[in-house]
């Protein structure tokens, strides 16, 4: 079933896939990485002027990585603003997604955290570097196939 925004995107020839609605009735759409930046700009102009959150997750061991954006259409005098959830999937072998920092500045630290934990590279992000882990850290801790390094030495009980 297509929601209001999906119908609008189809009407304007914008490629996407409807993933239905979440438990709160928020429409969820899948956008290809190569289409994401242009659609993000269009959504901003259309009124989705607030990036409420951005996160990422590992879909399955050895599978795709997903970057998730929760957008809100803030308007004066509207008590229940429209919301949409956008999912952009990238291959684990080369996880590259265009940054939306230049559309929504609040994407800054959120995209950096997704990079730091899952290794998704956000193209054209002005400061894409680790934010939680030390720069010397090897690997991406939230990937399902991540093997944690052995930090703890067995200490002598004496």
Curated annotation (Swiss-Prot):
EC number(s) from the headed UniProt entry: 7.1.1.-
Task: Give me the Gene Ontology terms describing cellular component.
Answer: chloroplast thylakoid membrane
Pfam families documented for this protein: Complex1_30kDa
Name the enzyme group at the top EC level: translocase
Q: Name one GO molecular function term.
A: quinone binding
Localisation? Plastid, Chloroplast thylakoid membrane
Q: InterPro entries, alphabetically?
A: NADH_DH_suC, NADH_quin_OxRdtase_su_C/D-like, NADH_UbQ_OxRdtase_30kDa_su, NADH_UbQ_OxRdtase_CS
User: Main localization of the protein?
Assistant: plastid
What PROSITE patterns does this protein's entry cite? COMPLEX1_30K
Q: Does the keyword Hydrolase apply?
A: no
Give a GO biological-process term: photosynthesis, light reaction
Please provide the record's keywords in A-Z order. Answer: Chloroplast, Membrane, NAD, NADP, Plastid, Plastoquinone, Quinone, Thylakoid, Translocase, Transport
What family does the Swiss-Prot or TrEMBL record give for this protein? Belongs to the complex I 30 kDa subunit family.
What is known about its subunit structure? NDH is composed of at least 16 different subunits, 5 of which are encoded in the nucleus.
PANTHER family in the record: NADH DEHYDROGENASE [UBIQUINONE] IRON-SULFUR PROTEIN 3, MITOCHONDRIAL, NADH DEHYDROGENASE UBIQUINONE IRON-SULFUR PROTEIN 3
Name the UniProt record assigns to this protein:
NAD(P)H-quinone oxidoreductase subunit J, chloroplastic
Q: What organism does the UniProt record list as the source?
A: Carica papaya (Papaya)
